[in-house]
Structures are given as structure tokens and as C-alpha cells.
Amino acid sequence: MVPGPHGGGARALGSRSILASPLYRDMKDKLNREVKHREDWRPFCPSLPIEDYRTYFEHGTESDFMILAYPVRAECRDAIPGVVHVDGTARPQTVRADANPKFHALLKAFGRLSGHPVLINTSFNVQGEPIVCTPADAYRCFRNTDLDALVLGDYLLLKDDQLQRAAQREDYQKQFELD
């Protein structure tokens, strides 16, 4: 997901983000190994609509910047295991509709489909590289990692489609062999 202006700092707050379902326990490992290329112990943060915060967290308050860790409600830990740290906490980002309407709407839509309006949200980069800045950066990272899809503004690119098109392009270009 690469909508809007580039944010500052080390956190991806809905722009230049890699988003994934937190519903699978192994999603954290998959993202760390196959996408981010970093240590397996490193956790991911949940983004959720501010109005759903108390459903998942007993303590704390709104957290726009993924700075503080709070205990995840015991009854929710198995529902969103991809964002729960080993100590039962998570470092949430609360999203307000007035501050980030598209990201808020995406979280709500995911909630309607999955029952949980929560997504793993991590910076759109791999270990040792800065967060993507341009569409070309985003496309390069997408092509060279195990990401399934890339959203650039109003465009959706699917990895399988991109691979198929690359193969078709190679076949097409073979007809123009040099003499």
C-alpha cells in the first residue's frame, strides 16, 4: 500500500506500508523471513480503527504512532496471533476516519470480511533499506520479495499477473531476434 505522502520516521502509519492478515500465527514468521528478511523474533504492530481499540486492548489509550505496548485482551489473543508479542502485548496504531479515511475504510472492510478490523502494519522496506519512496522503489521491492499484491494509488498489481505478463513479454520479444 503506497497511497499519499511519505511519512517521516521509522514507522509506517498506513502509507508506504506492508499490510497482512494477523489472523494466522505463522504470518509473523512469513513476513520476517520471506518479505522483510530479518530476525524471526521481531514482532509486528497491529493497526485498527480507534473505535475498536477497547475490543482488543484493556489498558492504554489511542496510539497514533505505534510507540507503546499494551496487553491484548486474553480473549482476543488467539484471534489475532500475528500481532501478539510473546508477553501478550502489542504496539497498536489506532486509526481515525478523519485523519486517514482510506486506511480506516480498509480496516473496516477487512473487519467485515474477517470479523476483526485489524491488520499487521509494517514499513514497506526490507532489512537494510529505507522505506520505499517512489512507485519504482515500491515495484522493485514488490517484485523481489514474496509480497502478493501492491497498491499504488488506485491501482492494484497482483504478483501472479506480473509474473504471467513478464513471461508473455519474453515470448513476444523472441520474435524480434537480431540478425
Functional labels for PLM-detected ranges:
Residues M1-D179:
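Flexible beta->alpha loop and helix N-cap segments adjacent to enzyme active/binding sites
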